[in-house]
Amino acid sequence: MADWKLRRQILRAACFLLVLTGLLAVYIVYLTTWDADPLAENPLNARTAAARADIWRGSIIDDKGNVLAETGSDGQRRYPYGEVMAPVTGYNGDKIGSAGIEAHANRELLGLTADMGRLGPISQLLQADRGNDVHLTIDADVQQAAYKALQGRKGAIVVLDANTGGVIAMVSLPSYDPNNIESEWKALSQAESSPLLNRAVQGLYPPGSTIKPLIADEALSTGTVTESDTFDCTGSLEVGGGQTIKDSSGEVHGRLNIREAIAESCNYTFGTIGMRLGDEKLKDAFHRFGFDREIGGDVLMTKSHLPEFGKLGRGDQAQTAIGQSSLLVTPMHMALLAAAFANGGTIMKPYLIDKVVTPGGVTIASTSPTVWLTATTPDMAARIESYMAGVTDHGTGTAARVSGITVVGKTGTAENSSGKEHAWFIGSAEVGGRRAAFAIIVENGGSGGRTAAPVARLIIEALNKK
């Protein structure tokens, strides 16, 4: 009897050890496959840190060959464009870690791939003493022009190649100088102006009237409104519950159709359309254009904050349709909205890294343009684009016009609970051999037509110099 009990205990122990060994094997497989890249990139990984100390970090280069970040002869990281390019390059510090392309392309800049990192000490023998160069889609000249156009005002600018998704410029103000990031870290991290916040992809703002092209697309696509329908704008729309939506400066537009309402940015018309659409169609509109989704890749964009569809009253439906209520979006996503209409209804996934090149000049990785979403039909995209052409031709955005170039757009003046309205302008132009889409926000800038549209003109002129 005693022998039988002993054998049973041994059997149980053996089974337990067998299961434990199996679980350990599964975990090791997981670590060496699915979780390998995060482990290799973890700043606490001593092996990666040791390799980093021995490697001459590669350069970050724009689409024309201009150096945006490099390692000097003293081993210190240098950023020739300083705060102009900080929202793109980010920084790389011994004590504070890294951000931007410096963080996202850390492995490439070190020439230390995750596969080599898994080789352990052997990787030290195979590793070159200089990392790879990372080439971006950014145009330093356009970036500088956009930075200068903001004239030191808080805000953000995004410029995209609508046909590929390549980011041409990404500006955020206030900014910081990555050359001095470690010595100024405490002051920067505590500053009320939030210079470390990349407003282009992390800043959330009410879009104001720049959202109206999306609303028009949904209204026409679903048959909720036709081009022949007219609205009698009295300058003030009662939406129930004691709420009233007014047009800018108390303007009364009279009778107009949806095309004219885009050009004149009529709140009465779009508030009415919002209530006709209702929660489900409004939700569908924002879903089709990706406002409820994350993108991923090397453009780390904060997801939009959408109203709680399904629980909105008529007032919030109307407010959402004019870009207010609880709706908050990033400048990057508004540039993608403009790009959708410029690219026949297709939104390309935005990206910054064009290619990775070894010290010997061999391209070891390159980015191919990728479709992110098909948001609307080519016919509808062309129709909305024609409406936006009216904005710059004779509507609220004439200040964005550039002689000899077709510019389309939409202005926005977004109410802001903490101060003066934000000025917006989104749009696109066929310029410099490509279709460029853009979004501009000037915090507390007031009228989008008077403040943001002239910024668009300066950017288009810079693109035209290519």
What feature does the model see in each segment?
Residues M1-W185, P195, L204-S209, T224, ...:
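Periplasmic/cell-envelope proteins involved in peptidoglycan metabolism and beta-lactam response
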